[in-house]
């Protein structure tokens, strides 16, 4: 197997992929030919999606969600977008931010650590603000989305106290 890497001289500052050209392959064994279109993704992603899963009570469910994300990632997904996952796999005072991406060399979805937080408190607005600022810095995008994993009172204000079973 041979791997060819093509690198553009300049960043793609536009909002969509740029076609750089076509590579024609002539295989000596069997005389087969094929062409591959080479394109460059934009330097700024079209969308960054953050899957934020605070706390540890739902860790088994969070891991299932992460596995689901990795099953969805392939050569076409997330396309020109990015998928980040931030959760607390080890302790309540620590968090890790990963990126799910397609590893073309291994032809499989992969996970890479982008940032570790050793002093993270999921209920502290300053910690959450810092994490969201890091999302913007580490995965710049035209648009952002967030999915928050939790169990709680949904959209009921916190000062309403516990809900009765019938009100749920």
Please give the residue ranges for each predicted region.
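C-terminal edge beta-strand
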Residues: 21-23, 32-41
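Short, hydrophobic beta-strand segments
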Residues: 1-15
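Active-site-proximal loop/turn and secondary-structure-junction residues that shape catalytic pockets
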Residues: 89-91, 150-154
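Surface-exposed loop/turn motifs at beta-strand-loop junctions within extracellular Ig-like
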Residues: 8-12, 27-31, 150
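N-terminal extension/subdomain marker
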Residues: 41-140
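Mobile, glycine-rich extracellular loop/lid and propeptide segments
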Residues: 145
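A short beta-strand micro-motif common to beta-rich folds, especially ectodomain repeats
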Residues: 4, 16-29
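A short, glycine/acidic-enriched catalytic loop
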Residues: 152-168
């Amino acid at each position: 197997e041979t791997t060819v890497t093509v690198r553009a001289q300049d960043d793609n500052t536009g909002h969509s992929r740029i076609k750089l050209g076509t590579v024609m392959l002539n295989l000596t064994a069997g005389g087969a030919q094929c062409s591959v279109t080479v394109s460059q993704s934009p330097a700024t992603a079209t969308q960054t999606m953050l899957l934020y899963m605070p706390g540890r009570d739902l860790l088994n469910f969070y891991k299932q969600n992460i596995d689901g994300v990795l099953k969805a990632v392939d050569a076409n997904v997330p396309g020109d977008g990015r998928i980040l996952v931030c959760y607390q796999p080890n302790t309540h005072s620590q968090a890790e931010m990963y990126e799910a991406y397609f590893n073309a060399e291994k032809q499989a979805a992969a996970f890479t650590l982008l940032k570790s937080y050793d002093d993270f408190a999921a209920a502290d607005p300053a910690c959450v603000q810092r994490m969201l600022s890091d999302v913007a810095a580490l995965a710049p995008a035209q648009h952002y989305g967030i999915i928050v994993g939790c169990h709680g009172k949904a959209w009921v204000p916190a000062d309403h106290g516990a809900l009765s079973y019938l009100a749920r």
